[in-house]
Structure formats: structure tokens, C-alpha cells
């Protein structure tokens, strides 16, 4: 049997760590729901998927990093939704870490670029760009890793979209299409 490519899906926050909360919409819940859609699509396409949490539980950043680093996975995608002081802030951001290890930096940036392109193709959302970031889960992991911010809960128009499962499913489809595009090019 061919060994399946393994992918880590990391739903941000959880348990008593709510992330952003706007009205009845709680980031930790939306992160998990979107991550479940991503995991289901990946499994359907023949990948081995490991999630850092499958329920509404608290998992420390250190534990998330350890899960990823022990996993021997090909890559990790961390899923979050955004918040800003300004209600006008809108769009998707994808972060990678400028790793001193050149190959990991390049792989993570290539993954981020591929995912951004596919997500925009499907969702027609605004792009705030692929950026380098210093988040623990992308900095301290040893496999290529990105952190997706799937839109602003603090923006009314975007919140309206994020409330709809169909939008989260299309976001998930874009993330999966991007992962597959990245893996096909062999820039692992």
C-alpha cells in the first residue's frame, strides 16, 4: 500500500480560549467547522489527516507544535478568522514564517501562495496578501506551515458570509485545492 501523504489541520483556539467573538459568532467554533470541512475533503481525496483538536477543547500552542513536529506530515494548515479595531478591515490573509532554514521558508511561502490563489478563485473574497508572520504554530513547527485568516468577524459584510456554511465550505475547498496544487508541483 502506498503511504498516504499526511496533512495536519489546526483549528485555532478552543475550550476557554474563544478567539474573536462577535455577537453569537465565536471564532473557535467557526475555526473548527471550517477545519472539519477541510479534513473531510482531504480524506475524500485520499490524504491522511490529523487534526490538532476535534472538539471544542483547549489545546496549548506548544501541544499543537508538538503534534505537528511528531507527525511526519508533509505540511500543516492552521485555520483562524480575523478581527480588527476598524470595522472596514476586510479580506483574507495567509501567513508563513520566514524560517532561517531556506527550504522550509520557501516551501511555506509556496504553500501560502498556492492556497491564497485557489481560495480567491473560489470565494472571490478580497486579498490582503500573503505575509510573513511570527505566530508560534508556524514559527516553531519544522514542517511547511501556514496560518489562514479566513476573513474578519469584525466586518459586517464578511461576518454575514462567514455565518453561512456554504461560504465556509467554499473556503475549505479553496484551501484543499491550494494544498493539492502545492503538492503537485513537488515544492514540498
Language-model-detected regions and their locations in the chain:
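Non-catalytic propeptide/linker segments at domain boundaries
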Residues: 1-7
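Short, surface-exposed beta-strand segments enriched in small/polar/acidic residues
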Residues: 7-21, 93
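Active-site-proximal helix/loop segments of hydrolytic enzymes
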Residues: 25-188
